[in-house]
Amino acid sequence: ANHEKRVLNIFTLALKMLSEKPTLPLEENNLNRELYLCANRVNGMLLKENRGQGIESTLMYESKNQPDPDDKTRTKREDKIPDFQWGFCDCKEADPDRMTKYFIIESKRLGSPSSSTWIFNKNYVVNGIKRFVDPEWGYGKSSHSGAMIGYIQDMELQNILEEVNTNAVSELLPDIQLSSDGEQPDITRLDQRLEREQIQPTPFDLRHLWVDLKHHYQDKDKTNQQIEEEVSKPKQTNKKSRTTNKSKGGEPPEEEVSKPKQTNKKSRNTKKSKAGEP
């Protein structure tokens, strides 16, 4: 419980730091990388303050699930890669094989869909929360809690929560509830208790930290789909630029083409007449 509390505190501060950056990338993986750097900075500052809020173990970024003592041979879950995991040694654990535990954190974007097939608020459930209950993914195995981070890029929080919970119910998962100390400026904490039939221990407490990043990406009227289209525009411009350069290199303007040809022709005639007139 103490490790969870410290991890959540560090990530809450790191998300605030992320939100205050002058610019941010749009894509999930790039946001995760920025958040990783923020979390390390926050943890370093807390360790220097020496108030017992920092964590001396290393935060792991995009690392595979570690082997679990209950798995006698290598399993599929060991090939899965959570966004973050923060290990610790549970000294209260009687079994030395089970003393090493990992707090797993998965991150997803939240808001309106970027396309008809990529729906963020559904993806948060299907490719996020479910990884903590699906044995093939096995996130949080042998741990009592884990976390999800949501990057809000547009839409209001209440509308997002309704859509996420609608998708959770359709996947036979419990609702996410606003935590008692949930709403802070730009950061919202929510809680969810999962029953895990095929992963121990159960029940499992999944914490949710949602950060409001809308101010980084858009005018109030723009959707995620419009943002995605704008992000792709520079690539089209570069393509045009390359085409133009190719055109300039391979097909000079007509006047430039005609002049060298006339000059070359005269040059050849001159040489011929010089050869005929010693």
Residue ranges and their predicted role:
Residues P82-P96:
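Short amphipathic alpha-helices and their capping/turn segments at secondary-structure boundaries
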Residues V42-R77, D83-Q85:
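A short acidic/basic microdomain associated with nuclease active sites
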Residues L110-P135:
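Mg2+/Mn2+-dependent nuclease catalytic core
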Residues F84, K101-S112:
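Conserved catalytic cores of phosphodiester-cleaving nucleases, focusing on short active-site segments
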Residues A1-N29, A39-N50, K72, W118-K122, ...:
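C-terminal tail/extension regions appended to the core domain(s) of diverse proteins
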Residues K80-P82, F103, G146:
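Residue-level detector of short, conserved catalytic/binding motifs and their immediate flanks
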Residues E93, S112-S114, E156-N159:
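Eukaryotic short linear interaction motifs
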